[in-house]
Amino acid sequence: MARNKIALIGSGMIGGTLAHLAGLKELGDIVLFDIADGIPQGKGLDIAQSSPVEGFDANLTGASDYSAIEGADVCIVTAGVPRKPGMSRDDLLGINLKVMEQVGAGIKKYAPNAFVICITNPLDAMVWALQKFSGLPANKVVGMAGVLDSSRFRLFLAKEFNVSVQDVTAFVLGGHGDTMVPLARYSTVGGIPLTDLVTMGWVTKERLEEIIQRTRDGGAEIVGLLKTGSAYYAPAASAIEMAESYLKDKKRVLPCAAHLTGQYGVKDMYVGVPTVIGAGGVERVIEIDLNKTEKEAFDKSVAAVAGLCEACINIAPALK
């Protein structure tokens, strides 16, 4: 049986980490692509040389021509410029929109049947533009954000309560940025909602709000520490979880930036919501009830994403 083919478009820190993780999980053969000739080839060879030690079978190749991604089952897009200290994700819009146009054309020509996961920032606007540039069905193009944001929230909660991360579930809605909406009411420790843990005296409302704010600032905190780039281990792990759910038809319930067609009162936009990912791509968008405060926060986040999409249209009118 032929192995799956995974194309990694962008071979920077996230791209290299994606290749290593995909190899370790034996998700398929891996092609690293980058316009910087030599980088994808070198990283591919380096990771391939780790396979006898780590005991995985996968062909890893690198290329600087889009024809190398031909027939890919999954494309994970990290191409673009990363954040530097003092920058918001939104500051990257103009540069990375042009990159998405090139990537979209490459996927359209060589991998029109792929499941596409976008990681490039500003995420919600870039995945929206990428879907339009590629012409792929909206359920086959998705943005990696919610899995990462929820993972950060879960870690901070586990540390606060001194429990295993495996026993913490967390929900983050909305855009992948300063207006994201971590939902305490739908987040649990051992099945107990955070709101109940406040009542039980495990944590104060004020401390919980501090953890929520740290989650919102999670990416910026790492950018500030690294000084020369942005996070890559956790984003790569998050995208691989999504790719695995698609390739193995696991039907995982994962929060991600999905195309909405009226759910949550949003049309023709990509916003972070809980989804079911299986062999059909995004097979279902799960609509949860939001109270007044949560709805206001979500609507504010949606408005921020809408503003970015409008900015994209001003740069590339063909997106309208």
From Swiss-Prot:
Active site, per annotation: H176
Catalytic activity: (S)-malate + NAD(+) = oxaloacetate + NADH + H(+)
Taxonomic superkingdom: Bacteria
Entry keywords, A to Z: NAD, Oxidoreductase, Tricarboxylic acid cycle
GO molecular-function term, one example from the UniProt record: L-malate dehydrogenase (NAD+) activity
BP-aspect Gene Ontology terms: lactate metabolic process; tricarboxylic acid cycle
Name of the protein this chain belongs to: Malate dehydrogenase
Residues reported in the UniProt entry to bind NAD(+): G10, S11, G12, M13, I14, G15, D34, N96, I119, T120, N121
Keyword check for Repeat: no
